Amino acid sequence: MKTFSAKPHEVKRDWFVVDATDKVLGRLAAEIARRLRGKHKPEYTPHVDTGDYIVVVNADKLRVTGNKALDKKYYRHSGYPGGIYERTFTELQNEFPERVLEKAVKGMLPKGPLGYAMIKKLKVYAGAEHPHTAQQPKALEI
C-alpha cells in the first residue's frame, strides 16, 4: 500500500462560518489555523494546501484572558530610524477589530508561499454580516 499524497487539483474545500462572540483569541486562532492548513482532514499533506475557507464574524467581540487587554502590544515599523509604533490590544481592537485575529492566525501558519496561500482563505468581519452567503458556508462551533 502506497502512502497517500494529496494533489492540489484534487483537494475539496468547504466554507465554514465561525462566530467569534466571547471566544478567547488564542484558542480560536489555533483552531482556525489548524483548519486553514487542513490538518483536520485525513488527506492532509504538509506540502499541499488542503485547508478549508473560514469566514469569521463578530471579530469585534473577541476577548483575551488576564490583563492582556492592556499588556499585549502590537508593534510595526515605518522603516525610518525611530519609526516604531506600538498599540495595545484594546487600541487595535477598537480601531481595526479584524486585524487582531488575522495577526494571531497568520503567526500560527507556515512562513513562505504555502502560508501566504493559506491566509488568503481566511475572511474576517467585525460585524455579524458577511458577503459570502453565495458559498453557503456551514456553521462551525469552536
Swiss-Prot record:
GO terms for molecular function: mRNA binding; structural constituent of ribosome. GO terms for biological process: negative regulation of translation; translation. One of its GO terms (cellular component) is cytosolic large ribosomal subunit. It comes from the Bacteria. The keyword Ribonucleoprotein applies. Keywords: Ribonucleoprotein, Ribosomal protein. InterPro entries: Ribosomal_uL13 (IPR005822), Ribosomal_uL13_bac-type (IPR005823), Ribosomal_uL13_sf (IPR036899). Gene3D superfamilies: Ribosomal protein L13. The keyword rRNA processing does not apply. Pfam families: Ribosomal_L13. Transmembrane segments: none annotated. NCBIfam families: rplM_bact (TIGR01066). Part of the 50S ribosomal subunit. Belongs to the universal ribosomal protein uL13 family. This protein is one of the early assembly proteins of the 50S ribosomal subunit, although it is not seen to bind rRNA by itself. It is important during the early stages of 50S assembly. This is Large ribosomal subunit protein uL13. It comes from Laribacter hongkongensis (strain HLHK9). The gene is rplM.
